[in-house]
Amino acid sequence: MMPLVAIVGRPNVGKSTLFNRLVGRRKAIVDDMPGVTRDRNYETVTRFEAPFILIDTGGFEPVSEDRLLQQMREQSQLAMEEADVIIFLMDGRAGLTPSDVEVVEMLRRVKKPVFFVVNKVDGEKIENEAADFYTLGIGTLHTISAEHNRGVNDLMEEVVAALPKSSTRLDDEDITRIAVVGRPNVGKSSLVNRLLGFERVVANPTPGTTRDSVDTLFACNKKRYLLIDTAGIRRKGKTTQKLEKYSVVDSLRSIERADVVLIIINAEEGVTEQDERIAGYAFEAGKACIFVVNKWDTLAKDNSTLGKFVDQIKTEFKYLSFAPIVFVSAKSGQRINRVMEEVERVMAQYSKRVSTSDLNRVFSEAVEKHHAPLSHGRRVKFYFATQVGTKPPTFVLFTNQPEGVHFSYERYLMNKFREAFDFTGSPLKIIFRGRDRRE
C-alpha cells in the first residue's frame, strides 16, 4: 500500500483548503462554517514523483458533550493512527489556542513524523503574530498560506522526504470502485460501517450528516475495493445553500468515478421520486447497479411483502431490470454479506469479454429468428459484431443503416446478449456502425 499522510487540526483552520490545494481540485467542501468536514476523506496524490494517500479529517476539538463533535474527534484520532506522517495545522489568524496546546502535547508522544504547520500566514504582520506558536517548543515550525499556495511546496518537499519507502504502487486497474448513493438518512454510512467492520464514517440520525464523498480502501476475499460513501442527494429545491450544492455535485461525480453503484432505498418509505432520479444518474453513466433495500427488519411482513417490493422496484426502474436486489439491515447486519457477494458477481459481468466467434454466433441466431423492422421501406441488414470495450461491455454492430435500427430492436438484441452470456447486473452498450456493401 502507498504511505498515508493525515491533515489534522481544529475546525476551520484550513485543512480542507490545504487538502484541495494538494489534490488539485475541489474534493473536500470548503466553507467558513466550522466542522464542515466531518469524516476522513482520502485521495491519491503525487508530489515530487512520490505517490501517497492524503487524508483530510474533521475538526479535532476538546472533549464535548455534543455527540457529533465527539465522533469527529474520534475520526481524527483514527486518521492519526492510520497515517505514516501527520500534518498538524493551526490557524495563524486566530492565534494559539488551548486546543492546539492539548493536541501538540498528545502528538509529542506519537512515534511517527509530525509536521507542525501554521496556516493563513499571508503577510509580515501575521508572520510576526505566528511567533506565539514558537512558545510550544516544537522545534521546526512551518508557516504557510494554503489559500494562496505560499510555503506549501517547501512543506510538502519535507513531508515526502519523511514518507516510508513504498515497494508497491496503487494499481487503479486492480481496484473495484463502489459508490454508495441514496437520499439523505437512508442508512448509507451505517451500511458502509457494517461492510468495513468498524466505524469508518460518522453515522448520525440527522439527515445530511455525511457532506463529502468519503473514500475507503479495503480488501474482501483477496480483492481490493474503494468504497465511496456519498452525501445524500436531495431534491433540487432543497439545495439552496452552497454547501448542499457542492455535496450534490460531489455525489454525481462519485457515481462517475464508480464501477458499481449501490442504490440504497429505505424500506420504510418505499421507492420515491428521488430514488428514481438517483438511479437515473447511475444508469445514464453506464454503471453496474445493485439495489440495496435497507431497514428491511423494521417492516411488518407477510408472505407477499418481499414479492410486492421486488415488483415495485422492477416497475419503477424498468431500465434497470437487470440490477439485482438485496434486502438488508445495516443496523443489525442482516444479509450484509450478500452485498459484497453481489458486487463481486456483478463486477465480473461488468468486466467480461466475449469471444468474437461466440458473439457473432448469438448475433446471427438472433437476427435470423427476428428480422429488424424496415426503415423507410428498406431492409436493415447486419454484417458482423465485435466487442470493443468493457465497464460496461460495449459492442459495435455493423449494418447498412445505422440510423434505421429501431430502439425496440436494439433492446431485443441487448436482451439476447444478456441471456446468452449471463450479463446479469451489468448494463450493456450497443453502437450501430455503417458499413458499405463493398467492405
Curated annotation (Swiss-Prot):
Residues 3-167, 176-351 form the EngA-type G domain. One of its GO terms (molecular function) is ribosome binding. It comes from the Bacteria. Signal peptide: none annotated. Gene3D superfamilies: 3.30.300.20, P-loop containing nucleotide triphosphate hydrolases (3.40.50.300). Associates with the 50S ribosomal subunit. Belongs to the TRAFAC class TrmE-Era-EngA-EngB-Septin-like GTPase superfamily. EngA (Der) GTPase family. This is GTPase Der. It comes from Geobacter metallireducens (strain ATCC 53774 / DSM 7210 / GS-15).
